[in-house]
Amino acid sequence: MRIDYASSAMDAQDFANLFENSPKAPGQQAQKFNRLMIQGLAENGAVVRAVTARPVTGTNCPSKFLSANSVQRGKVRYHYCSVLNVKGIKILWQTLSAFVTVLFGGCDAVVTDVLNASVAYGAVTAARLRKKPCIGIVTDLPELMVTGTNQNHVKLVRKIMQKCTGYVLLTEAMNEPVNPEHKPYVIVEALCDSTIKPQPEVKTHTSCIKKCMYAGLLDARYGVKAMVDGFVLANVPDSELHIYVNGPYVDELQKVTQEHPNVIYHGIAMNDEVVRAEIEADLLINPRPTHEEFTKYSFPSKNMEYMASGTPVLTTNLPGMPEEYKQYVYLIEDESAEGIARAIKTTFDTVRSERDRKGYSAQEFVLNEKNNLFQSKRVLSMLEAK
């Protein structure tokens, strides 16, 4: 089966080459999710062409025009659509580029990231004209995106979803608002990279420092302030909190780092660097509050990345996280700063070898049962059933 996969996903090295020196590099979670799905489809025998609208803006790329080009990366052909990096024109240009590419590309099916509305609208429109199936990847409800909503964007994404013939969703709760016509769908939660090298059941520790880490959007809605305050309150001896990525909380965070040298802010980093840091850490924390409505509609992809590292995970009891995951993580029951402080102290009171085994079991679980080869095969089966 020949599949055109329309999104902003770039090959990892191509992405790094374009953005590694940019002070405002695009978010990498969507990049990683789509790239893993693309690679999984290809490894399962599909002939995949990634139809990519590179995520450039006036603030992260000085070039006003990027020409189209195609490159082969392993089993995947990346077709980078041309970019006219001019506000007010860029989105229309991307839509037309994706439309033409898919319309005349000869694919058997289209898969698209519906939240990347410009490339998705072009791709799904071309698929409908060619009477080909189009699967929409829905990783968030457009109305509830924590990064902000634009009503025109919400309406366009809703229109794209209506045009799709099936869906890939992260939680069962998403099905009702996304799929009122009861079209075929699969739940994949998140994707674990099948190429990850498993960590040993008990790690070799070369430092007495207890290194905590958070890598995600720095937003109070994500519980970051409560986490930082909780870490400071916990006052665990010989402990550090390392924080990556960016967001509106960054100014306040930098003030905290001046008062508390063991809170260390690294800024934006490429995902490979973040993953290496996760492997080297002693505890990975996800403080996302459970009361926010969006949490029941999305699986925390950060938890998947955390669990895949083999490092133990401390997370809130998110409604979008199925029960089968919870035996592999430590849970924050009280999401206040005081509650997070208690959870951190309780976790570090656990024998280190036991914490290591918890992290090892989590990695084994996601590598064996939630890897991108297994999950993408389910998507391919849905397409082949049409």
Predicted segments with their positions:
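N-terminal subdomain of nucleotide-sugar transferases
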Residues: M1-S63, G166, D229-A234, L318
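Conserved donor-binding/catalytic core segment of Leloir-type glycosyltransferases
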Residues: R2-A6, V168, T204-F231, H242
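Membrane-proximal helix-turn-helix segments that form the acceptor-binding/catalytic region
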Residues: N34-Q39, F99-F104, S118, T125-L129, ...
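Donor nucleotide-sugar binding/catalytic pocket of nucleotide-sugar-dependent glycosyltransferases
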Residues: E143, V157-Q199
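Nucleotide-sugar-dependent
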Residues: Y222, D272-A277, N286-E305, T315-E323
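Nucleotide-activated donor-binding/catalytic signature segment of Leloir-type glycosyltransferases, i.e.
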Residues: D251-E278, L283
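Conserved acidic donor-binding segment of nucleotide-sugar-dependent glycosyltransferases
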Residues: V329-E338, K345-R352
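A charged, aromatic-enriched C-terminal amphipathic alpha-helix characteristic of glycosyltransferases
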Residues: E335, R352-E384
